[in-house]
């Protein structure tokens, strides 16, 4: 899973693409409505004008997608560390985490030393056991 900043960048890229798609759709499929009653309705024989119901339905879908993406972006922004946290609090948290990391690293080193000690003890026991078996076989042969 990607980090939150990468997710945020991807969402921003997606919403920019959605805005562009919406503008392109409106530009290519809108009806030529005059701004006021005094103007004549324009037309373009090469234009592909969508039916009013289809146009409205598609606009609703495009806006819903943009609203959902905006909510996702807001949620990601709110989840970022440091939002509503002062610089001093962030530095204090970093210092606390560094101390905890040093402690955990110390525990890790102790665990590794313990593992090595136990491994050495087991190797010695195995060697003693195999030597004992070898000695008993020699005594039985003699």
Swiss-Prot record:
Coiled-coil residue spans: 87-131
Complex and partners: Component of the Mediator complex.
One GO CC term on file: mediator complex
Family membership noted in the UniProt record: Belongs to the Mediator complex subunit 21 family.
Entry's localization field: Nucleus
High-level lineage: Eukaryota, Fungi, Dikarya, Ascomycota, Saccharomycotina
Name under which the protein is recorded: Mediator of RNA polymerase II transcription subunit 21
The keyword Disulfide bond is annotated on this UniProt entry: no
Lineage: superkingdom: Eukaryota
InterPro entries the UniProt entry points to: Med7/Med21-like, Mediator_Med21
Gene name, Swiss-Prot/TrEMBL: SRB7
Main location: nucleus
């Amino acid at each position: 899973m990607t980090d939150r900043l990468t997710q945020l960048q991807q969402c921003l890229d997606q919403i920019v693409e959605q805005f562009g798609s919406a503008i392109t759709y409106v530009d290519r499929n809108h009806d030529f409505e005059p701004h006021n009653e005094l103007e004549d309705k324009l037309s373009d024989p090469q234009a592909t004008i969508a039916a009013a119901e289809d146009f409205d339905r598609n606009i609703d879908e495009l806006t819903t997608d943009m609203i959902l993406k905006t909510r996702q972006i807001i949620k990601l922004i709110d989840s970022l560390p440091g939002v509503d946290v002062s610089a001093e609090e962030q530095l204090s948290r970093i210092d606390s985490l560094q101390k905890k990391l040093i402690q955990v690293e110390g525990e890790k080193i102790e665990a590794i030393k313990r593992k090595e000690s136990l491994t050495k003890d087991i190797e010695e026991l195995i060697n003693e056991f195999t030597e004992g078996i070898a000695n008993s076989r020699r005594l039985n042969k003699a």
